[in-house]
């Protein structure tokens, strides 16, 4: 039996090449897909036909722990599957009926984790906000990727790019802890360094413009008019179509296989989770600036109406 655990989304959308229903339609031998990403509440399994003409159940339980999914699968002696699925609402009034032995076990781990998460990296004199087309936190994030490429791989990246949706929280004024950094960058992405031709880099900036702006490094100057690129320079120069440029980004964007990134070469992915790399970067900033961590907008992205 093959059960696929997916975080692609239930139905096709504008940003993903693949999605749960489409995976079934274009494959064989998957017996069930348990999906995520789109936060779809499926009260009943959606049976989608695969390439062999078999009906494959696709299920998803919504979001925020509101429901549990229950699936009962039976395999006959002949190898045939029968399937029963339902959503079970999680009832908050049962919270008082905790298994104390289990709770005590969790508490022991929580104390260890909390001690690590509460470790102070530095101090932020003021809040560091996110937003589009440009923001202090977006700039800090993109510049961090440039630093990582140099620090870990001795690569002088020309461009860095981070997805706006990957920045999930803002940084408050005061002490910055490891837990705060994990809240800003909660996903298990990794640093990805690659080489792109200038023509593909232009395509990538078209995507940035159509998205209303995304975190890019200080070497970029991008002017957006409406949702189009009006002008863009890298390190003070126009982009040359046949020139090679080094880009530092994350595997999530690389794996989309779009916006010119699909043509990138010499890709190298870090073995380290990106949020731990951000912890290193913030430690570096604090060490260089008397314990302080700051960020600001500097005009790297301008949007004209």
Protein language model features and the residues they cover:
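Divalent metal-coordination and catalytic microenvironments
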Residues: 3, 33, 37, 73, ...
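Short acidic, glycine-rich surface-loop motifs adjacent to enzyme active sites
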Residues: 1-13
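Short, Asp-centered acidic motifs that coordinate Mg2+ and/or phosphate
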Residues: 1-3, 31-32, 57, 159
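Active-site-adjacent helix-turn-beta-strand microarchitecture at beta-sheet edges
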Residues: 14-116, 213-216, 223-225
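Hard-cation-handling environments
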Residues: 87-176
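Feature captures C-terminal
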Residues: 48-56, 67, 139-305
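Sec/Tat-exported extracytoplasmic proteins
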Residues: 6, 27, 37, 62, ...
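Short, ordered loop/turn segments at secondary-structure junctions
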Residues: 7-8, 37-39, 164-166, 252
């Amino acid at each position: 039996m093959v059960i696929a655990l997916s975080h692609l989304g239930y139905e096709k959308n504008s940003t993903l090449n693949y999605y749960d229903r489409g995976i079934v339609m274009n494959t064989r031998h998957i017996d069930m897909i348990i999906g995520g990403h789109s936060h779809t509440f499926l009260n009943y399994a959606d049976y989608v036909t695969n390439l062999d003409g078999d009906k494959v159940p696709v299920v998803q339980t919504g979001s925020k722990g509101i429901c549990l999914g229950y699936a009962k699968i039976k395999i006959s002696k002949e190898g045939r599957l029968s399937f029963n699925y339902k959503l079970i609402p999680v009832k908050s009034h049962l919270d008082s009926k905790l298994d104390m032995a289990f709770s005590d076990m969790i508490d022991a781990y929580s104390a260890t984790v909390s001690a690590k998460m509460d470790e102070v990296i530095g101090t932020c004199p003021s809040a560091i906000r996110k937003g589009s087309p440009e923001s202090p936190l977006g700039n800090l994030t993109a510049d961090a990727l440039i630093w990582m490429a140099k620090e870990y791989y001795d690569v002088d990246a020309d461009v860095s790019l981070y997805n706006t949706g990957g920045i999930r929280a803002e940084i408050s004024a005061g002490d910055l802890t490891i837990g705060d950094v994990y809240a800003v960058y909660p996903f298990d992405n990794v640093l990805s360094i690659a080489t792109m031709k200038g023509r593909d880099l232009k395509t990538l900036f078209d995507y940035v413009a159509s998205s209303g702006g995304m975190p890019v490094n200080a070497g970029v100057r991008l002017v957006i008019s409406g949702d189009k690129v009006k002008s863009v320079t890298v390190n003070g120069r126009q982009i040359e179509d046949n020139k090679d440029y080094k880009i530092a980004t994350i595997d999530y964007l690389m794996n989309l296989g779009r916006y010119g990134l699909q043509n990138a070469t010499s890709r190298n992915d870090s073995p380290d989770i990106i949020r731990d790399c951000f912890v290193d970067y913030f430690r570096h900033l604090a060490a260089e600036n008397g314990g302080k961590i700051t960020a600001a907008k500097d005009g790297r992205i301008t949007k004209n109406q």
